[in-house]
Amino acid sequence: MFVLNRSSGLIHRSVPLLAQVSTPTTSTTKLAQLHTTHALSKEDYYKTLGVDKKSDAKAIKKAYFQLAKKYHPDVNKTKEAQTKFQEISEAYEVLSDDTKRQEYDAYGSGGGPAGGRGGAGGFHHHGNVDVNEIFRRAFGGGGGMGGFNFDNFAQSAFGHSAAQEMVMDISFEEAVRGATKNVSVNVVEDCLKCHGTQVEPGHKKTSCPYCNGTGAVSQRLQGGFFYQTTCNRCRGSGHYNKNPCQECEGEGQTVQRRQVSFNVPAGTNNGDSLKFQVGKNQLFVRFNVAPSLKFRREKDDIHCDVDISLAQAVLGGTVKVPGINGDTYVHIPAGTGSHTKMRLTGKGVKRLHSYGNGDQYMHIKVTVPKYLTAEQKQIMLAWAATEQLKDGTIKGLEKNQKTEEKETKKNEEKKSEGASESQKRRSEPVAENAETIDENQENEGFFEKIKRKIFG
């Protein structure tokens, strides 16, 4: 790209994709270069945003927002989206500023309206494009997009309307105990600049010239009949706003960010909604309760698992049990088995729509040690020796049990009269040792056996 200097007649070669900046009026002369996406033609800015050249500031801002939702780098990670977002940000920066827009409409970017009769080089964009700064100026909030959720746009600092419903994540403990939460929401309030008058400060509304301040106009029908309709110009107000407020665009209200504090009721369930008033606005907060690692909730009752040792299960004792309002010690009766269910009355969740609290249920689990010390094993064997088993055996006590069974049988045989010795031998069979025979040795002759005995 070459730029003609008309005063000197020289042709200077400019760097591609760098917009030229006019010389500042201060004593220090600097050239602030703007890295643009491409050389835009006169219609390009409008085409980039998808708006007409007659679009007002509100339509341009809305179009920019719709495109930002689609191409912002925090939402769309592709390189094409980054380039597109740079383009729409550049276009919005020019078209949202009245002075820059007038200059752009007059000169374009590649020459004047007649194709080159404008100023040298046509329209040149001044300053550095910071897409985050442009976005911040357009919609408020921080420059970055961290934590920005386009699905909940109305709840964010960048929204065009007040938030009517929002979802809040709370912990299990906050839900059952209650908590105080702070949140930032969008509300529609009177414009801070015009205070709801819709008129630029220093000006007043005038009487509507189309209805003479009546708010209605008369129209004549065929047959000589007349009927009145609402004035389309003033919409029935009877006033004409010649100087609308620039901040609210004559609406009298703007979306403003408010910090509000509210109480989460104790006993809140997952999915419950809370309605409260923020100025003139109603806000519904729906709670998303995170699951607990300790408790399981069933309506107003809570359940928890409690581990006890083998000795506690047999002998009884006390155990520390977690609760929603703090830990407590509970007595464990002697002989408590695993999966025993115990109840603590009134230790559950506070009832939202009635008095009192639910109950807390403990599910006992007896923990059995996998490894024992030598001392512990001897103690367990001594205890096991005193047990009367109906079926089965205990590892480590098999020999003692077999000896006792033999002695019992002998005593029974002595008491029985007329029992023969053969019957006693049959009642006490003795296992014999069997020799293992090789199949090849079974078919050997007499001399082969002698030879094998002598020579091996």
Swiss-Prot record:
UniProt signal peptide: none
Molecular function per GO: ATP binding; heat shock protein binding; unfolded protein binding; zinc ion binding
Domain of life of the source: Eukaryota
UniProt entry keywords in alphabetical sequence: Chaperone, Metal-binding, Repeat, Zinc, Zinc-finger
Biased amino acid composition, Basic and acidic residues: 395-429
Domain named J: residues: 44-108
Entry GO terms, CC: mitochondrion
Protein name per its UniProtKB record: DnaJ homolog dnj-10
Cysteine disulfide partners in this protein: none
HAMAP family to which the protein is assigned, alphabetical: DnaJ
Alphabetical GO biological process terms: embryo development ending in birth or egg hatching; mitochondrion organization; nematode larval development; protein folding; response to heat
Residues in CR-type zinc fingers: 178-257
Acetylation as UniProt keyword: no
Source organism per UniProt: Caenorhabditis elegans
Residues covered by region (Disordered): 395-443
Ranges in coiled-coil conformation: none
First and last residues of every CXXCXGXG motif repeat: 208-215, 231-238, 245-252
